[in-house]
Regions:
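Thiamine diphosphate
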Residues: 143-146, 150-280
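Glycine-rich ThDP/TPP pyrophosphate-binding loop and its adjacent helix/strand module
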Residues: 1-144
Length: 280
């Protein structure tokens, strides 16, 4: 994320909830270049981001030089070791590094121009006028990134095949969930609600939610501190919490914006179906 993201309300909502839920696998890299489109960040933002995230129960690491790849790598490795807190890595960078206008808003949303682009490349020791990717970069990518990906993929497949042998039913459920395959039949239930049915829609919704939850074990429901009003709670199921990540009721707190963003992310990731309710 960048300096602009740190000013958005949804960022705080999501960070607060992630810290509360001790999401230790979450690592965020913050590109701190202290420049926004209209000028220096100091015009509109003076918070101590490190202290804010520490207050939200995050581990906060800092890389002094954003051009030092090894330091970034070390910080990510340290972030992976932390199991009980999300990690924010503040990476201090210079926007437009190598350009004549580096460190200013002039390189925020505008092209460098041919001459300045050429000079920026020369400052890196890269003597090419046009866009060019050296062959050794392709080779390095194949050797490190693709080979590493294949190795991890094969290792995961081996582990999953062993899991399938030991837990065939659960493995099938997982495969179906990832593929978005599930059976759902609420035709009989819907017969209870003919046109003109005289009841609050949230009461009807509550009954439908219970039936969907019964038929689909990957279905989760949540709300922004309004479960008693919007009637979104799955009965006889626990809340999702630090103590119980198996809970099917998502407690977002009064964080409506983050609730919607998180649900979008969960849906795109696949493996679960989610719903939530709120007030407009």
């Amino acid at each position: 994320c960048g300096d602009g993201d740190m000013q958005e309300g949804v960022t705080y909502e999501a960070a607060s909830l992630a810290g509360h839920l001790s999401l230790g696998k979450l690592i965020v890299l913050y590109d701190a270049n202290k420049v926004t489109l209209d000028g220096p960040l100091s015009m509109s933002f003076s918070e101590n981001v490190k202290k804010r995230y520490e207050a939200c129960n995050w581990q906060v690491l800092e890389v002094k030089d954003g051009n030092d790849i090894n330091e970034i790598h070390k910080a990510i490795k340290k972030g992976k070791k932390e199991q009980f807190k999300p990690t924010l890595i503040i990476v201090n960078t210079v926007i437009g590094f190598g350009s004549a206008n580096q460190g200013t808003n002039k390189v925020h949303g505008a092209p460098l121009g041919k001459e300045d682009g050429k000079n920026a490349k020369l400052s890196y020791g890269f003597d090419h006028d046009e866009f060019y990717v050296p062959e050794e970069v392709y080779e390095d990518f194949k050797k490190k990134t693709i080979k590493r990906g294949k190795s991890k993929f094969n290792k995961w497949n081996k582990l999953f095949n062993e899991y399938k042998e030991q837990y065939p039913t659960e493995a099938k459920q997982l495969e179906d969930a990832i593929a978005g395959k599930y059976s759902l039949n609420i035709d009989e239930l819907l017969k209870n609600y003919p046109v003109g049915h005289n009841d609050a829609t949230r009461n009807t919704s509550l009954e439908v939610i219970q039936e969907v939850a019964k038929q689909n074990p990957t279905f989760l429901s949540g709300t922004a501190d309004l479960a008693s009003s919007t009637k979104t709670k799955i009965k006889d199921e626990d809340d999702f919490s630090v103590e119980n990540y198996n809970g099917r009721n998502l407690v977002f707190g009064i964080r409506e914006f983050a609730m919607v963003a998180i649900m979008n992310g969960m849906t795109l990731h696949k493996g679960v179906k989610v719903s939530a309710g709120g007030f407009l």
